[in-house]
Amino acid sequence: MKIIAFHASRAAAPKRRRRRRRNYRPLLVLAIFLLIICAIGFAIHQVFSQTDTDENRYPITYVGSLPVHEHFVSEDAIGRPGGTREIEYVVIHETDNFAAGANAARHDAFIQENAKVEKLSWHYTVDDHEAYHHIPDNEPAYHAGDGMEPNGGNTSGIGVELCVAEDNDYEKTLQNGALLAGYLLWKYDLNMDALKKHQDFSGKICLEHLINEHRW
């Protein structure tokens, strides 16, 4: 009887151990889930928050593979109205400048000079390989043609200009613009309804390419 009891107890032991292991499984699953969430958060941070400095000493943020050069217009420029606002829209434009070499860097040089004396500004310019950031996202700018209308394109929208120069790859520019716009919608917790055309605020046929080709 003792031998039988001994074998019975040995046979029962693994079952008890298996039951104990099963009880730990929910904790193990939770730990793995938390590790995955942390990994995703770290990956998002790495993809959207990498910074560097270019040869002109402008800070660079990478939105995916797109380098975004931060070169803000002077705070005392007429084209930088200042103040902060609630961001409600991402407003897409085309530069309407078809001259060869009219890329994002050239438009950055243009806005730096012209915003000093004109009510003229927007937040980003994008071409087929890079982007420039001219006005902080949380400040209004003069890009939508609707003055300082409350909840309008200027007061509540981030203006993004897409380059259309003859030597610029427009399709690649569209891809880069979509990448930047998607990031801005994500960053400011906006839905797709917040993605607007310049035309939506002033009636101007802009973005001319996409509107005339019935792509938007």
Task: Give short role names for the model-derived ranges.
Residues 5-6, 52-53, 71:
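Generic early N-terminus positional signal peaking at residue ~5-7
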Residues 2, 21-65, 84, 163-216:
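Basic/polar, cationic surfaces and motifs that engage anionic cell-wall
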